[in-house]
Amino acid sequence: NNITDWVIAGARQDERFELVAVCSRTQERANEFAAKHGIPHTFTSLEEMAKSPLIDAVYIATPNYVHAEQSILCMSHGKHVLCEKPFASNAREVRQMVETAQKQGVTLMEAMISTLNPNFAIVKEHLKDLGTIRRYFASYCQYSSRYDKFKEGIVLNAFKPELSNGAMMDIGIYTVYPMVALFGRPQKVEAQGIRLHTGVDGQGAVNFQYEGMNATILYSKIANSSLPTEIEGEKGNLILDKIHITNTVDFIPRQVVGQGQ
């Protein structure tokens, strides 16, 4: 998919990187991908690829429900792993992944671009300008191109719970990840959402409680929103145009209208 193409293009900007192999379920698809990107070796068995001395690290961009299994397999053979978001289907699987990485002495990283965006560093740098922070609000609502098919009775992968898909796993995570990166683990969580007939969440809203601060996230694959993300402090606000890939960050200082206002 496009994301994999972007990752490869970005990685090739580093002269230390060499793309040596690809693994796919069929030889035909492996050959097609290898030809597209100039990859010398192909595999149809992930275990065989994980055992290969040709490889130092693996990028995993498979369906969500196999992320943990495949990451653990690769790490068990001493390979570093960059795994697409979401890391896994649940917290138990994530713990198993982290434990395997620690045991094997390898690097395990989630491919979450939003907190690696240069503008996210700007946000972190200027949090102090906000004074005491009182609220984090983030919204990522994007009508899915696959939802019209869903309403026609054609259920594509994006709306299949058995693949660990759904709105939170696909795009809601982009609103949560920066929040935790900036403010840590919340004290309390309350959530509500709309569940589609297949069992996946189509959209949702989650409230988080921190010491002296509230956080709210909105996410959807069945409706659009143009709302930006905002971090509100007693001395001003930071406004991010898009939480998943931030292009602009604006600081709006609190205006003192008059004494007692």
Map each language-model feature to its residues.
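N-terminal Rossmann-like dinucleotide-binding module
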Residues: 1-37
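Predominantly a Rossmann-like dinucleotide-binding segment in NAD(P)-dependent oxidoreductases
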Residues: 114-187
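Beta-loop-alpha module in the N-terminal Rossmann-like domain of NAD(P)-dependent dehydrogenases
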Residues: 7, 37-100
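Short active-site oxyanion
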Residues: 18-21, 56-58, 108, 165-166
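Rossmann-fold dehydrogenase core element
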Residues: 95-113, 132-136
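Hydrophobic residues in well-ordered beta-strands that form the structural core
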Residues: 43, 83, 108-110, 240
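C-terminal helical cap and adjacent loop that interface with cofactors, partners, or active-site loops
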Residues: 257-261
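Contiguous beta-strand/loop segments that form the cofactor/metal-binding neighborhood of enzyme cores
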Residues: 175-248
